[in-house]
Amino acid sequence: MSSYANHQALAGLTLGKSTDYRDTYDASLLQGVPRSLNRDPLGLKADNLPFHGTDIWTLYELSWLNAKGLPQVAVGHVELDYTSVNLIESKSFKLYLNSFNQTRFNNWDEVRQTLERDLSTCAQGKVSVALYRLDELEGQPIGHFNGTCIDDQDITIDNYEFTTDYLENATSGEKVVEETLVSHLLKSNCLITHQPDWGSIQIQYRGRQIDREKLLRYLVSFRHHNEFHEQCVERIFNDLLRFCQPEKLSVYARYTRRGGLDINPWRSNSDFVPSTTRLVRQ
């Protein structure tokens, strides 16, 4: 269990509790979680973070009424900056989006501006929102993470408790390599409910070569670990930077959707540009 799982900042969350669904607009449904909860134990300070990045959300269940009462549907794309004070708690995000269902808006841009304003207020940081009509996305191909998949290794694993031990002495040689490694075996669990979160992860780095077996064992050790998606990605970035000391590092995870939302955080200390096309499990 994470050291902050019982922190008072989490006590008021609707996550893990029985809730009523509202279908008329209510911005108060949104709830934030301080990023400092997991950053402080990692020694990460807001004024000296070793990375930049965003939390990319895809909104698949977004609907409202136009001025004449005709339902509208869209797919939303949200990017929440890493410098925001809070991350957005996903169940509250779902409940908030449901509150649009029977609410009339004059036009699509009013919806976009409302989302951007409310999310920025909750996160206490920069948020950008784009809305797409369905015909804009139809025929869009399934994407994939570029890189070498490290999953098909003939190894025995019997420990699924999180540990950084596997990353000790995980680099070899003095030669500097530049490579991208991919795993689809990332599984962590919700900090509050302990429900499973399934993801694929892409690790791009420049530095001494990282042992792929040790890296895979480390990633598999998240299997019983309880943390939010964004927190896991920052933990992985921080651990790799600390133990493997690459010159450049980017960590990008795309998680499967839950409640009509998927969360795709990335962190980097280089000029990394993430692909935003959904993966096969999304």
UniProtKB/Swiss-Prot annotation:
| Family annotation (Pfam families) | QueF (PF14489), QueF_N (PF14819)
Under InterPro entries, the record lists: GTP-CH-I_C/QueF, NADPH_dep_7-cyano-7-deazaG_red, QueF, QueF_N, QueF_type2
What UniProt keywords are attached to this protein's entry? Cytoplasm, NADP, Oxidoreductase, Queuosine biosynthesis
EC number(s) for this protein?
1.7.1.13
In which residues is substrate bound? I88, E89, S90, H229, E230
Entry superkingdom: Bacteria
Where does the UniProt annotation locate this protein? Cytoplasm
The protein's matches in PANTHER family, at most eight in alphabetical order, are given as:
NADPH-DEPENDENT 7-CYANO-7-DEAZAGUANINE REDUCTASE
What family is it from? Belongs to the GTP cyclohydrolase I family. QueF type 2 subfamily.
Q: Cite the record's note on assembly.
A: Homodimer.
HAMAP family recorded for this chain? Answer: QueF_type2
Tell me the protein's name. Answer: NADPH-dependent 7-cyano-7-deazaguanine reductase
- Organism phylogeny: Bacteria, Pseudomonadati, Pseudomonadota, Gammaproteobacteria, Enterobacterales
